Amino acid sequence: MDSESVVAADGADCAIANGEVTMEGDSSNGNGGTSENLECCSTQHPMEASEGTQNEQVDDSKQMRGQKVQGRVKHEKTSGGKNIPSVLVKKKKDGKVVASNGSVAPNVKPVKSPKSKSLNGREAHVTKHGNHDSLPAEGTRDKPKLRETRKQVNDTSEDDTQYPKEDDGKPRRASALPNYGFSFRCDQRAEKRREFYSKLEEKIHAKEEEKNTVQAKSKETQEAELKMLRKSLNFKATPMPTFYQEPQLPKTELKKIAITRPKSPKLGRKKTNSRADSEEAITIQTPRFGRLSLDEKTPKDNPVVEGSVPGETKKPPVRKSLPRLPSEKTNLSNGKVAPAKAVTASTKAKSERKKPDKDVDDLSQSSPVDDNADPEDSQEQAPRVNEDRNESHMVVEVVAVEP
């Protein structure tokens, strides 16, 4: 016969000692005089016991403890080599449990009544070695259910602690933001700023409109006042004539002055040529002195220039129309004119060309005067003119350098 083990759900334990079965339990009623027969460790109804276990949920820890106890009981049975028969257990009024063979088990405690067991809703579990495989299968079914329930409980507790619930009491999702009952101060301040700026803009627009209206009124009043003044005036003002206005100054045109530079002297010339050129330059640059009259003498203050006649001096302006005196004739006949040493041929030719023209002019001017004069004077003047012509060839113009 196979070994069996008995486990009580309400805390009662079955002990095997010396081939006898004893049962320990707490009695709810101390005065219970009825005896009952418990079928424990029976091999006749293993399926009924297994069906009763399916309706109950047992924690993992209790199942593990029960399995350990079963292993110990089996080991003791195999070592003893005895088979345990089914035993009827009776309960006396004294509260002691007596076996069918008449021996009393030591340390026996009163057993609970079936009423208390039915009230508590717990039953004894009987497991058999042959049906051991069916129990772990049922335990594996119960384990995922327990894990799922535990996970749900833990998730709900974490959600309650981490995220607040809505007003309705429904938990929020993890991704959704919490809806707080208050609003941020930033939003309130932003609204106040908008209101303040809108009021400022309205004030600014109102001020601008007032300014525009005031300016328009001021212009209208000024125009009306000017019209009244014009009407009150007895005369009309005419525009100012143009000649009262100051004329604009004429613009002075700047004339460009021609820059003339003197020619540089040629150093490669001969000495003779350089002397002749210097003499020509002296004659050209120095002014010419007029002829002196015969009766005048050269002053002592003015020195005589080289190449000049000693008797010649500056000639004061004399009227050409006046006749010459006989004393002048004698001076001209007695005086000798010395030719100039440093006079060139060019100066002589120029003087010869100019002097005959002057003499012709003198004759033309003196002719009307001579007509009125005596015939004797006219005869005397004729030889004078001839003498003057002859002397003009011999007279050389004196060149003097002004200091």
Curated annotation (Swiss-Prot):
Chief localization: cytoplasm
Keywords: Cytoplasm, Cytoskeleton, Microtubule, Phosphoprotein
UniProt feature, compositional bias: Low complexity: 103-118, 336-348
A GO term from the CC aspect: cytoplasm
Sequence segments annotated as region (Disordered): 1-179, 254-403
Tissues showing expression: Expressed in seedlings.
Top-level taxon of origin: Eukaryota
Polar residues bias (residue ranges): 25-56
Gene Ontology molecular function, alphabetical: microtubule binding
Family label: Belongs to the TPX2 family.
Name of the protein in question: Protein WVD2-like 6
Organism: Arabidopsis thaliana
Gene name for this UniProt entry: WDL6
